[in-house]
């Protein structure tokens, strides 16, 4: 059984027991969260596709950890003009473990 849900402007395909890295959620570590924006649920041959969301579809997950991703360097450079700017960015994320999928 697997499902596709939407969180943080992105779509994720998950199954029970899987750990997924999402955009930062303001929920403490160890708490549970429910995602109601379920786009599709597949259980063997039975497939439910939402328009746009599946009615009664809920994905339950437990927040495992929060953190920051790898550093991305942004460089602006103009040749022969003695001009160079550097900037770095580290995006916050939340790791969640999928505990249940229901339709």
UniProtKB/Swiss-Prot annotation:
Q: Which InterPro entries match?
A: bL21-like (IPR028909), bL21-like_sf (IPR036164), Ribosomal_bL21 (IPR001787), Ribosomal_bL21_CS (IPR018258)
PROSITE patterns given in the database record: RIBOSOMAL_L21 (PS01169)
Q: A GO biological process this protein is involved in?
A: cytoplasmic translation
Q: Which domain of life is it from?
A: Bacteria
Which GO terms of the cellular component aspect does the record hold?
cytoplasm; cytosol; cytosolic large ribosomal subunit
Which keywords does this Swiss-Prot/TrEMBL entry list?
A: Ribonucleoprotein, Ribosomal protein, RNA-binding, rRNA-binding
Q: Which family does it belong to?
A: Belongs to the bacterial ribosomal protein bL21 family.
The record describes its quaternary structure and partners as: Part of the 50S ribosomal subunit. Contacts protein L20.
PANTHER family hit by this protein: 50S RIBOSOMAL PROTEIN L21 (PTHR21349), LARGE RIBOSOMAL SUBUNIT PROTEIN BL21M (PTHR21349:SF0)
Name the record gives this protein: Large ribosomal subunit protein bL21
């Amino acid at each position: 059984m697997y499902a596709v849900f939407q969180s943080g402007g992105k779509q994720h395909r998950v199954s029970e027991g899987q750990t997924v890295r999402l955009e930062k959620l303001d929920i403490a570590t160890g708490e549970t969260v429910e995602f109601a924006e379920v786009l599709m649920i597949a259980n063997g041959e039975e497939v439910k596709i939402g328009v746009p969301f599946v009615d009664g579809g809920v994905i339950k997950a437990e927040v495992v950890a929060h953190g920051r991703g790898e550093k991305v360097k942004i460089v602006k450079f103009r040749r022969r003009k003695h001009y160079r700017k550097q900037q770095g960015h580290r995006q916050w994320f939340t790791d969640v473990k999928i505990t249940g999928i229901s339709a």
